[in-house]
């Protein structure tokens, strides 16, 4: 079974480079440029094995809003929060939600490892 990931990142170069890297690892990737787009995909797609979301994005919904929407629909989905604006408070909030927290710049091999190991554990 193929791992399916939703990648939410407003920076187009970061999003595209990350998506290309994950696809080369045989991961199916859907992309969203903002929180609203991501929430629409979450509510209309059957399932995601993992969600990777930037914290700060333009628009109404931020990364934690996206993660909360995913967890309401599928609490077992692996969620990874990525931010260039890290703080102990943000990290604690993410961990309280059961979310993997990574600060930018993110190592793509590390991200792939988190996706594959966590998605495998959470897939029924």
Where are these regions (language model features)?
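Two-component/phosphorelay signaling modules centered on CheY-like receiver
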Residues: 12-30
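Conserved acidic carboxylate
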Residues: 9
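C-terminal output helix
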Residues: 89, 106-116
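Acidic, metal-coordinating helix/loop segments flanking the phosphotransfer/catalytic sites
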Residues: 20, 31-50, 55-58
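As written
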Residues: 93-102
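The C-terminal output helix
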Residues: 116-124
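Short amphipathic alpha-helix used as the core "switch/output" element in two-component signaling
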Residues: 40, 64-76
